[in-house]
Each structure stands twice: as C-alpha cells, then as structure tokens.
C-alpha cells in the first residue's frame, strides 16, 4: 500500500505549491462559501474580485452595492443566491461575535463550540477553519479528501457517509505526525486532488500521479479486463 507521505510527495510534485486557505476567520468563511460546489479556479477568481471591491469584512459585505457583490460572487459558479445569503448570514454572525478569533485560538473544544452556530460552514469547513485559522490538529474531511483517502485505502469503506468520514479521519490521524504543518499539507493536497482529478464520477485516472499504486484504480482495471 502506498504510504501517505509518498502520496503527498507525488501530489506536491504534480500540482506544485498550493495556496492554503486564508487564516483570517472571516475571510476563510468567505473562502468556504465560494468553495461550495465550485472549482478552485472559480473560487479564487471570486475571492480576488471581492478583495478588489473591497468586500472582505462583515461590514463591507453589507455596505457593498448588491450588483457589485453579485457580479463578484457569480465568478464562483452557480448557486449565487445561496452564496449571497450565506455571506450575509456569516457577516451577521461575525458582527455578533467580535471575539471569535480569540475563542478559536483557545482549546479545541472551545473552538468547536464557537463555530457550532455557524451552520453555513458545515463540519468540514469548521475543521478547516480550526486547522488553518487556529492551528488545531484536526482533519477537515470534506467530500474530496474523504474520497481520495478512501480510494487509496485510508479508512475502511462504508456505505454510510458519516461512518466513512470517521474512518478516514481515524486512518489519517494514525498516518500523520501531530505537527500542524503536516496536517495542513495533507488536507490541502488530498482535497485539491479530489476536486480537480480524483472526481466522484469519471475521475481522470490516466493523468493521476498515484495511479500505479491506487487500489481502487487497480480494482476497476481488473473488472474491465
């Protein structure tokens, strides 16, 4: 079985340096909203457009003219109305909780509790904010990361998504050192690979740098031969 470290080295060689999510909590929240059902390229284009307005603070989200805000958010792809609603709901939440950054930097339990009411973020988004924004050693097992890890054999397969996520997180926790940088690197590259190459349907296996050691790809190849 391919080691996680070897897999990450190959992904780094294939994709080159990847930009991590912003570490400022509200900007990271905006990043998550733009990232929802989108591609990294579209997400980054929309974030850059909001930065140019500028509209990357809770107050500026509300002060920006609707047409300007819509034009920027539309760059992230479909679901524009849902994204706008999520941005405004998040802006309200952050204005009501000006001490959020301090709470996130406390204990992991305190950080989780601080984000519990921010429903638009979701579990993976909350964990990503805790990892990249507050240096807590959690694994943000979003759908992309979970799919890639599972296909590589990290985490026992399960038809139950929640159980699969738990299995994946346990397997990655056992395979990764406790260092925050190592966990950020794993989260960044596994999730990115799942969003652009190791797709849920019709994955781009011929170009994948992990192909020769991927048990799922081998099983598929054997089924067709």
Briefly describe each language-model feature range.
Residues 3-224:
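Catalytic cores of DNA base-excision repair glycosylases
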């Amino acid at each position: 079985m391919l080691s996680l470290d070897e897999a990450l080295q190959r992904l780094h060689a294939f994709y080159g340096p990847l930009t991590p999510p912003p570490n400022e909590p509200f900007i990271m929240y905006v990043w998550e909203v733009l990232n929802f059902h989108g591609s990294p390229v579209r997400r980054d284009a929309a974030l850059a457009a909001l930065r140019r307005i500028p509209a990357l603070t809770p107050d500026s989200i509300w002060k920006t003219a609707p047409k300007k805000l819509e034009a920027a958010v539309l760059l992230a792809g479909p679901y524009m109305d849902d994204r706008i609603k999520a941005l405004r709901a998040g802006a309200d939440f952050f204005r009501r909780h000006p001490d959020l950054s301090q709470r996130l930097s406390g204990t992991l339990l305190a950080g989780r509790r601080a984000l519990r009411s921010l429903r638009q973020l979701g579990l993976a988004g909350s964990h990503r904010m805790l990892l990249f924004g507050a240096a807590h050693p959690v694994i943000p097992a979003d759908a992309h990361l979970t799919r890639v890890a599972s296909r590589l054999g990290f985490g026992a397969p399960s038809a139950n998504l929640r159980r699969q996520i738990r299995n994946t997180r346990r397997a990655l926790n056992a395979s990764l050192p406790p260092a925050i940088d190592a966990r950020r690197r794993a989260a960044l590259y596994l999730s990115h690979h799942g969003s652009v190459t190791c797709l849920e349907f019709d994955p781009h296996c011929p170009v994948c740098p992990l192909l020769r050691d991927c048990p799922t790809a081998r099983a598929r190849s054997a089924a067709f031969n």
